[in-house]
Swiss-Prot record:
May act as a regulator of the protein kinase A (PKA) activity during embryonic development. One of its GO terms (biological process) is epithelial structure maintenance. It comes from the Eukaryota. The modification Phosphoserine is found at residues 209, 408. Its main location: Golgi. Ubiquitously expressed with higher expression in kidney, liver and placenta. Detected in embryonic kidney cells (HEK293 cells) (at protein level). This is Protein PRRC1. GO terms for molecular function: identical protein binding; protein kinase A regulatory subunit binding.
């Protein structure tokens, strides 16, 4: 049957013919058979181009002739210029049935290849194949076996992974004719799909990771809970530093837009006011300047205490020690008889801010003073003392220092109440700092 169809087969033991001879034979074919010519002029060429050329690693039984759906018209062959023959062998004529089989292969026997690239295939030779194999640039060894498994077990089949929008770049290994001539065996172009990273995905992942890092930092910075934890940690560190070295407190919290001058150079007053305002405002620059009260050393009554505190501020402004617009805080202690024969020591605090027109007064808690110590201070003051209208010449602290052991004139409150004068001034200063903050415009807070 193969002889009737005009197909010559090569036995398995027969070595493949020399490709040089094949090329020479193809070039020497001067007359073109009618069947081959009509097959190329048939409109079924497009269907043939969509299938790769068939090749067999082992002899296969020939396909039964398939009759075309319509008779092929007779087309006279065109005039072909005469070429000197290189060899004397000529291919046998091809029958119309065989030409039709080669010109219109059945679709059901040859599924389309998914691994071969979608390119136009070269035209087949004018004559029928004269061997059991052929070489194609896009041939896939896993295809073309009429639906059966490949005959070469050493060649595994590869299928390209399916991905949306991602096509791996196939690497096509071309077989050279030199290796074929040396008898290495049947070679063909085998498509090995190689999965490569899409640069779009890599770039997107890099941007996402970078964006994720920055987004995490921004989210942490704007998280109220994290901010609260950081503030508490900062406060704990500052507290530890100031506990180990109390002298570091003015340097840690010094700064900001709030600048305050205390009208005294005594540390008991300056430190108390500094701690209070830095506690309320966070950062504040607080310094002390000695100011004159121009009243008696021991003021008596609320009016005298308020007068002494205000006079300290005015004296610094008159002498040019502080600017006319400078915010100042003044502290003045006085004694007052709140009840019959009941005397108390009280501190008066004044805050004056000319820029914002703020003027505030407050008082510390009252510390009881025994009557005998007040009477001693009154007896030590001359009757013709020019400042007797405002108070006494001798302070209560001086009398207590002389009368009691281990009592300081500047901080005798600890001995009588267990609370230092600095703590009393701090409590009142913190209250007046809160009132001052409430009256400031929002932009300056």
């Amino acid at each position: 049957m193969m002889e009737e169809s005009g197909i010559e087969t090569t036995p398995p033991g027969t070595p493949p013919p020399n490709p040089a001879g094949l090329a020479a034979t193809a070039m020497s074919s001067t007359p073109v058979p009618l069947a081959a010519t009509s097959s190329f002029s048939s409109p079924n060429v497009s269907s043939m181009e969509s299938f790769p050329p068939l090749a067999y690693s082992t002899p296969q039984p020939p396909l039964p002739p398939v009759r075309p759906s319509a008779p092929l018209p007779f087309v006279p062959p065109p005039a072909v210029p005469s070429v000197p023959p290189l060899v004397t062998s000529m291919p046998p004529p091809v029958s119309p049935s065989t030409a039709a089989a080669f010109g219109n292969p059945p679709v059901s026997h040859f599924p389309p290849s998914t691994s071969a690239p979608n390119t136009l295939l070269p035209a087949p030779p004018s004559g029928p194949p004269i061997s059991g194999f052929s070489v194609g640039s896009t041939y896939d060894i896993t295809r073309g076996h009429a639906g059966r498994a490949p005959q070469t077990p050493l060649m595994p089949s590869f299928s390209a992974p399916s991905g949306t929008g991602l096509l791996p770049t196939p690497i096509t290994q071309q077989a050279s004719l030199t290796s074929l001539a040396q008898g290495t065996g049947t070679t063909s172009a085998i498509t090995f799909p190689e999965e490569q990273e899409d640069p779009r995905i890599t770039r997107g992942q890099d941007e996402a990771s970078a964006g994720g890092i920055w987004g995490f930092i921004k989210g942490v910075a704007g998280n109220p809970m994290v901010k609260s934890v950081l503030d508490k940690t900062k406060h704990s560190v500052e507290s530890m530093i100031t506990t180990l070295d109390p002298g570091m407190a003015p340097y840690i919290k010094s700064g900001g837009e709030l600048d305050i001058v205390v009208t005294s150079n005594k540390e008991v007053k300056v430190a108390a006011v500094r701690d209070a305002f830095q506690e309320v405002f966070g950062l504040a620059v607080v310094v002390g300047e000695a100011g004159q009260s121009n009243i008696a050393p021991q003021p008596v009554g609320y009016a005298a205490g308020l007068k002494g505190a205000q006079e300290r501020i005015d004296s610094l402004r008159r002498t040019g020690v502080i600017h006319e617009k400078q915010t100042a805080v003044s502290v003045e202690n006085f004694i007052a008889e709140l009840l019959p024969d009941k005397w108390f020591d009280i501190g008066c605090l004044v805050v004056e801010d000319p820029v914002h027109g703020i003027h505030l007064e407050t008082f510390t808690q009252a510390t009881p003073v025994p009557l005998e110590f007040v009477q001693q201070a009154q007896s030590l003051t001359p009757q013709d003392y020019n400042l007797r209208w405002s108070g006494l010449l001798v302070t209560v602290g001086e009398v207590l220092e002389k009368s009691l052991l281990n009592v300081s004139r500047t901080d005798w409150h600890m001995a009588f109440t267990g609370m230092s004068r600095r703590q009393m001034i701090y409590s009142a200063a913190r209250a007046i700092a809160g009132m001052y903050k409430q009256r400031l415009p929002p932009r300056t807070v």
